[in-house]
Amino acid sequence: MTGSEIFLASKRAAITYDTDPATGEPRAWLAPGGTGNVVAEQAGVLNISWIASADSEDDRRASALNPDGVTMELHSGREILVRLIRHDPAVFRNVQNFMTANLMWAANNYGWDRWTQPSFGSDAREGWADFGRFTRDFADAILKSSAQSADPVYLVHDYQLVGVPALLREQRPDAPILLFVHIPWPSADYWRILPKEIRTGILHGMLPATTIGFFADRWCRNFLESVADLLPDARIDREAMTVEWRGHRTRLRTMPLGYSPLTLDGRNPQLPEGIEEWADGHRLVVHSGRTDPIKNAERAVRAFVLAARGGGLEKTRMLVRMNPNRLYVPANADYVHRVETAVAEANAELGSDTVRIDNDNDVNHTIACFRRADLLIFNSTVDGQNLSTFEAPLVNERDADVILSETCGAAEVLGEYCRSVNPFDLVEQAEAISAALAAGPRQRAEAAARRRDAARPWTLEAWVQAQLDGLAADHAARTATAERFDTAPAVSTRADL
């Protein structure tokens, strides 16, 4: 794909706007963490522009004032040009608050118990219709940006844009298209929970991509099984990780990402106020994650209490570091309440202020907590990858052990170098906490060195290159395969969205 022009898109931007009180004009600032920042750094590596959604009224106003985009400097020092799409506010609100943050997130992350939820009413159909309009906005913006390009390459990121590849393929049938999904893909049986038009429509939107990427092998396998289960006219090759469907050939690829070296180097870590004094003279156990049920802090706290009952945790404190995220989603707000309850009960049993919650979105605070920790817990119930599991061992200064969920995407890379646990088993997690804190200095140092060596190769730059190399190879294979379908009737996927 030498000489090709690359076009990058994701729903979430790394920048957002508020109003400058002095001037009344929109003021840009870098949003913390998340997929948006990962994609932004990718744009910086490739030195290309990036299309994303305007999330707020201030974002929309800034977009109207800057139709050609805004240049921002990232934490790594790289500069990017971002152009924000202005969606119909009602459409965007429904897609943001219901369709993606609630319905699609729950479907991909096993958020429903199936006994009591979900029940799909007319709101699901309305959300799906708005999702189609939202998807069309993105496809139109990408196609407009690439209209003058003879040889465009499209990099489309995350689950909110799963319908975009089909619409791009209709207009640019020969273009290389990569869709990278940053979250898990559930089992085929779980995917069947969704209404028929949604569960198949999403697959129809994705399969025209040349390459579909996930962070872990298990998500690729689950996706292939969903296709095999729901699309009887698809030909699945599980060894080659390919799908042939209605003239399309799609390759599934696992492309792990760990961290951005420049971003880590560009941080200024500082512990949150009061934490240094509180932790002084104590071993510190740190659990870190968003205010999202998948991050599983409640069970981590309860496992810590179990471990303490067994002895050996004297002079040990636990910090639950939570980053506020999507608290308008009922499941997230309920999760925060459950964590607070677990912490209160832990302190009632173990002594006041043994366990603390620290709740903000300052990444420098998070990095500083990683550095100070004597034990790190990442026990997600499920996770597409979890970059913190790579970042924390690399910045830690105390040879902290790591407890890592076996259902986290990162476990495929780091599992053998961490204490791998079933995230639902409190006893196993308690035993892992006790064993980690009982380990001697030499054992800890040797394990930490092996863990750092395992994490270090998985840089942002390597991940970006893996996308480009994989897409180039898959585009060549797809082109060869397409010749076999020259006589097949054309099938439009427009109606699927």
Curated annotation (Swiss-Prot):
Q: Which UniProt keywords apply?
A: Antibiotic biosynthesis, Transferase
Q: Drop me one GO molecular function for this one.
A: alpha,alpha-trehalose-phosphate synthase (UDP-forming) activity
Q: Which residues bind GDP-valienol?
A: 158, 290, 295, 321, 325-326, 361-362, 366, 387-388, 391
Annotated residues that bind validamine 7-phosphate are located at: 182, 383-386
Presence of the UniProt keyword Translocase in the record: no
| Keyword Transferase tagged | yes
Q: List the disulfide bonds.
A: none
Q: Which SUPFAM superfamilies match?
A: UDP-Glycosyltransferase/glycogen phosphorylase (SSF53756)
Class of enzymatic activity (EC top level): transferase
Query: EC no.?
Result: 2.5.1.135
List this protein's GO terms for biological process.
antibiotic biosynthetic process; trehalose biosynthetic process
Catalytic activity, reaction form: validamine 7-phosphate + GDP-valienol = validoxylamine A 7'-phosphate + GDP + H(+)
In terms of InterPro entries, this protein maps to: Glyco_trans_20 (IPR001830)
Described function = Involved in the biosynthesis of the antifungal agent validamycin A. Catalyzes the condensation between GDP-valienol and validamine 7-phosphate via a nonglycosidic C-N bond formation to yield validoxylamine A 7'-phosphate.
Subunit structure as annotated in this protein's UniProt entry: Homodimer.
Q: Which family does it belong to?
A: Belongs to the glycosyltransferase 20 family.
Annotated PANTHER family: BCDNA.GH08860, TREHALOSE-6-PHOSPHATE SYNTHASE
What is the protein's given name? Validamine 7-phosphate valienyltransferase
Source organism per UniProt: Streptomyces hygroscopicus subsp. limoneus
